[in-house]
Amino acid sequence: MRYGENIANRVARWMMVKPDLDKPWLSVQYPNPYTKGKIVISRGARWHGEYFPWKQIVEEFKDDLVFVGLPEEHYTFCSLFGNVEYLPTKDLYEVAEAIAGSDLFIGNQSSPNAICEGLKHDCIQECCLYAFDCVFVRNNKQHITHGELSFTHGTKSFNASPSYPKHGHRIVFNNYEYKANQPHLCVAMLRADLILQGGSYSVEEMNSWVERY
């Protein structure tokens, strides 16, 4: 099991098949018209990322956001990041209809994100660094590993930089700083970015680059 390999490829290797994961494997007959022009969001209870700018997204796009998921997930999200509209769904097909009808999906590694991937819909994914197994690189998807995010929705442009701690650990790589309270998080952020870019260094080598600041 290789770090950064997605779950679909792991299952395919076990089953000795070679699916074309670049093409959609889910479809929706009637996308939900209610989510047209909106951003569908979701955040499950597990698999959270580091420094993902949820609060800034809510502040900038609150009126355009529609949350799908469990009621308790919506409650937790609003408690942490601000109130957003909730769209009740009776099953995962209704979640798929909501995502398919929207302009964009933003979410962490959860079932709505898996549905979005199956649809190959425009996506911004909050990546979990200790379970980095939902990596599907495509032109209309961003994998956010350390909070840096830029995108456009309607007439608005959004740009966010990670809110790193004032003191902690860091790795400087290609003139970019990866900062965190714990050294292993610096390594994890860099390691994830290298996988997305097609590069590779050993964990031991990256550990040697960590310094205090």
Residue ranges of model-derived segments:
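Catalytic machinery of carbohydrate-active enzymes
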Residues: 1-213
